[in-house]
Amino acid sequence: DVPDLQFHFSSAWAYDMYDYGKMPLHDGFTILPTLLKPKSRGTVSLRSSRFDEAPVIDPRYLSAAEDRETLKRGMRIARDIVLSSAFDGLRKGSELNYPAGEWTEDVIQQHMEQATECVYHPVGTCKMGTDSEAVCDPTTLRVRGLQGLRVVDASIMPDVISGNTNAAVVMIAEKAADLILSK
């Protein structure tokens, strides 16, 4: 078994963790349950042959039923943590900002649809491997079908690792440096 959830504890709270302008100006905290092994797969495709046009990105977050169930479990765990006696001095009574009240399946589903966002570790848009969906050769990190182009970042990871991607990306970069220098 490998972990399928990670909990990010933040010393700020907001409905959108990336919109600092809308964060309340008083004490609070957030627990973000994060999927470590998502099954949902999005797409990145070219809008046109023009270099100055942004690609079409469809993340398809939570399109896999298993991801929705895992995240619901994570939300319940986070709520249990916040409501535990260890957090009594950190919240006002039993106050939770959202979703408030009874946690029905509908309330949890609505919150997931409104508040889900990508947190820190997107991978796989230039997957390395030998299968038909692989873009990069795992032995050279070169993009198949193009000359002179390697991908050296988290986008070559076929799947997100259970944990933060920084150390793995450093290892990918070290391998790429060895490949380039040994040429």
Model-derived features with residue positions:
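FAD-dependent oxidoreductase catalytic-site/capping-region signature
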Residues: 1-168, 176-183
